[in-house]
Amino acid sequence: MTLGTKLSVDQEYLKSFSEKHQEPAWLKNLRLQALEQAEDLPMPKPDKTKITNWNFTNFAKHTVDNEPLSSLEDLTDEVKALIDIENEDKTLYVQRDQTPAHLSLSQELKDKGVIFTDILTAAREHSDLVEKYFMKDGVKVDEHKLTALHAALVNGGAFLYVPKNVQVETPVQAVYVHESNDTALFNHVLIVAEDHSSVTYVENYISTVNPKDAVFNIISEVITGDNASVTYGAVDNLSSGVTTYVNRRGAARGRDSKIEWALGLMNDGDTISENTTNLYGDGTYGDTKTVVVGRGEQTENFTTQIIHFGKASEGYILKHGVMKDSASSIFNGIGKIEHGASKANAEQESRVLMLSEKARGDANPILLIDEDDVTAGHAASVGRVDPIQLYYLMSRGIPKEEAERLVIYGFLAPVVNELPIEGVKKQLVSVIERKVK
């Protein structure tokens, strides 16, 4: 197989992997077909970011063996800080590299028909349900080489299913711990909320090691029925040696359904992030709030897109990013209103603050409108720290580093304060504190 870089798995390996995990025939066949498709599909072409030489395929091992946790106390302090250890009623999934290490789901939620488990177990035990949605309504296998490779190599992730008329009152959490230098992660998260249901899902990606050249290919899909609501929070905190492709996509299928995203994109390595919400149903609502801090020499590209198909649909994008050192980033915000989506409203704001002469940021607001009776607006700004602000703070006896930190918090606060998940707010503040030192 020729992918510019040699891929370390082949068809025979995938057959063996699928059989080992007792996967249904549809998933095994999907893997094999996807690997073939990846041969000919092009790489994605993120706007203004050249990824030709990025490593998305070269990794030592597709999986490594880890042990399940005998207790959450066995986690490192850094990981335990993300979890409410004392809460005995928490709904939690912990994954160590690719290994499902801990799962807790209350009997009450089980009795209501809620399913929450790792993606490979879900494919085996709830085959028809997973097959119905897996890379169908959200991300398609053949979009480009990286989506095809993801479909072929999925080795982790979670499945969350909320039946009709069920409201999950407390957040569902998944923690994905990267602790091996040798392995790649192809994580797939699939969330389905049936009619008149609601759920909040929060995930953490965290590295406890810093490999030289790791590969992460992450896809999340959210599907909502009539009047269903999903709030999806994420804090990505992977180390500088990890090259990441992450694609989070929502499909608001049902009328008056809602998908909200609260994303803290804090990776230290090169990252391509796509976040698209398709508002198919009439009266649907999509909202994406994103906070980014880049540092070192990393290159990042963030594309946030809300596409309106349904009448009277509403879409809001709010992104603030801070670039330090020699980091560079592209922020693309796209509001697209398709023909027939009358009364739709598309609004967006993207702002980038650069803290050094070598830092680079670019904000590109884009509106694509194919309908007359709509409302749309955008705002964007890119700039450096105002020296007058720093001078004012320093003149009050505040050291320069502390003054810069206060300016950064002031810049990011309008987004952080608007995040709909309190736990994500607290985690983000902690990560921001570490990254802006």
Swiss-Prot record:
It comes from the Bacteria. One of its GO terms (biological process) is iron-sulfur cluster assembly. InterPro entries: Fe-S_cluster_assembly_SufBD (IPR055346), SUF_FeS_clus_asmbl_SufBD_core (IPR000825), SUF_FeS_clus_asmbl_SufBD_sf (IPR037284), SUF_FeS_clus_asmbl_SufD (IPR011542), SufBD_N (IPR045595). Pfam families: SUFBD_core (PF01458), SufBD_N (PF19295). The SufBCD complex acts synergistically with SufE to stimulate the cysteine desulfurase activity of SufS. The SufBCD complex contributes to the assembly or repair of oxygen-labile iron-sulfur clusters under oxidative stress. May facilitate iron uptake from extracellular iron chelators under iron limitation. Part of the SufBCD complex that contains SufB, SufC and SufD. Belongs to the iron-sulfur cluster assembly SufBD family. This is Iron-sulfur cluster assembly protein SufD. It comes from Bacillus subtilis (strain 168). The gene is sufD.
